[in-house]
Structure formats: structure tokens, C-alpha cells
Amino acid sequence: MMRTIKVGSRRSKLAMTQTKWVIQKLKEINPSFAFEIKEIVTKGDRIVDVTLSKVGGKGLFVKEIEQALLNEEIDMAVHSMKDMPAVLPEGLVIGCIPEREDPRDALISKNRVKLSEMKKGAVIGTSSLRRSAQLLIERPDLTIKWIRGNIDTRLQKLETEDYDAIILAAAGLSRMGWKQDVVTEFLEPERCLPAVGQGALAIECRESDEELLALFSQFTDEYTKRTVLAERAFLNAMEGGCQVPIAGYSVLNGQDEIEMTGLVASPDGKIIFKETVTGNDPEEVGKRCAALMADKGAKDLIDRVKRELDEDGK
């Protein structure tokens, strides 16, 4: 009897595209499973008119989906790794981390003007504190204007509203089939450190589902898994959500060691903590990077930013 695996997904075009891609790959690994997609609307999808940092950070796009997993209404879910909270509900696991897409941020501007050449006070659209803080480190004169909506909506707003440029994740553009020529320039990690897990997917399931976990083990990419787990350990130790400008990105160096860079900044980009740590164990590398930065005052900064946001929200 062929097992039908119910897959939970957000409704957005990007989420559905990612989910269908994962299903296709899993069918190639083992054709003896059937798959059925169940669309789930999350809190983050329902709130469209405020910045994410004001409505409670991480987990906004996954909570309802995780509830459906716990209730056994679905068997697995495909998420963007950067939407995943650092700690999962009991009984659930990230069963699989496929190969990572491009982790960089992409700048798309009117008339293809590069960041360094933009006029003083140019208006940049982003709804990410991490991106805006790092843009302001490089160009303190820029005006940051919040922007929400899917890729198509944002590209349209760039054309019709008073934005000089917008910043999007390169991975999302690529998965949605946008050609690289829409991008004015890719921001290298040295200039704009990516969000933890940016460009990677997380496939979540119940810890007890051995059949699915066995299937997933054939689809996990070891390089991505090691590097992303270090980033997530850093995020967890820093207790950072969407509410603070926090970034973490890892690569494997020539010696096959994890090289992890973490960043915490004030929203205006005036205070920056940045450290790079090398080691073999993802959990240890992430924690050590966080501890180094906490010693220098990064943790105090996070607490202060959270307090200020709470007061703003009242």
C-alpha cells in the first residue's frame, strides 16, 4: 500500500514553489510515496501592514504549521530556514536540510545604480532590521523605508513608489525563476552578512516518523547541514529573533572546518559586534561565537533593542 505523505505549506508563491521542488526531489529518491499538499495560513501571512519586528519575530510563519504536525493533520512541512525559531516544539525535528541556495542579499535599484553610487539620502526598501542596520553601516546617509509583500509586489513597488532600491534574498529570486539580470548587485557576506540559515530550507517532521526520517537522510546535504547548524546554535545562544539586527553565516574552509561569522548591530548601524570563529563541531562553534560577542557587550545591546521595541509597540 503506497503511503500518502501530507505536506504542509504556506500559500505564498515562493512557499508553494519550494514545497513542490522538495516533493519532486523526494519522489526521485523514492518513487513509492505519494504526496499531497495542504495549504496553511500563518499569522505572518495574515499580518501585512506592520513590520515583523513589531509583531513578535521568529515563528510567525511556522507556528500554525507546527501545530498541524503535532495534531497529525500533516506529516511534514517545508520552511525557509531563516523563518525557523531556534528551538522547536517537543516532538518535532528538522529531519532534513537540502543543499543551500545562494545565501546573499540582492540589491535591485532603479536605473541599475549601485549602492556606493546612490545619491545622498537615497530611499531603500527593506523590512529587515538586519539588512537596514548593515546598509547604514556602509551608508549612514541612506533613508530606510519599510516594505512588505511578496517578491512581485516589492518589485512593483520599486517601480511605482518612491524607492530608489530594494533588498531581497537572492535565493528567493532564484527559486521563483527570476534571472540574475534583474539584480543590480549581489551584496557579498563581507558587506551584508546573511540571516541565519538564509538560502537554506528546513524540512520538519515528527521525531517518531522513522519512515520519513529514513527518506530524508538521503536528501540532506552535509555541507549545508554543518554550516547551518552552527548558525542556528549561534542564534539560539544569542536569543535573537526578527526583533534585532542579528546575522550569522558559516562556510567550510580548506581544512573542512566550520568558519562562522556572527554579527549583532544597533538598528541605526552605529554599534557593531562582529566575530569569526573556527572549529569542527557546529554547536560548539555557534555557542563560542555567541559567547565571544556577549563578552564584548552584544547581549546587552540585544536586550536594549528589544526593550526599546517593546516600548515603541506600547
Curated annotation (Swiss-Prot):
Its cofactor is dipyrromethane. CDD domains: PBP2_EcHMBS_like. Its EC number is 2.5.1.61. InterPro entries: HemC, Porphobilin_deaminase_cofac_BS, Porphobilin_deaminase_N, Porphobilinogen_deaminase_C, Porphobilinogen_deaminase_C_sf. One of its GO terms (molecular function) is hydroxymethylbilane synthase activity. Binds 1 dipyrromethane group covalently. GO terms for cellular component: cytoplasm. It catalyses: 4 porphobilinogen + H2O = hydroxymethylbilane + 4 NH4(+). NCBIfam families: hemC (TIGR00212). Tetrapolymerization of the monopyrrole PBG into the hydroxymethylbilane pre-uroporphyrinogen in several discrete steps. This is Porphobilinogen deaminase. It comes from Bacillus subtilis (strain 168). The gene is hemC.
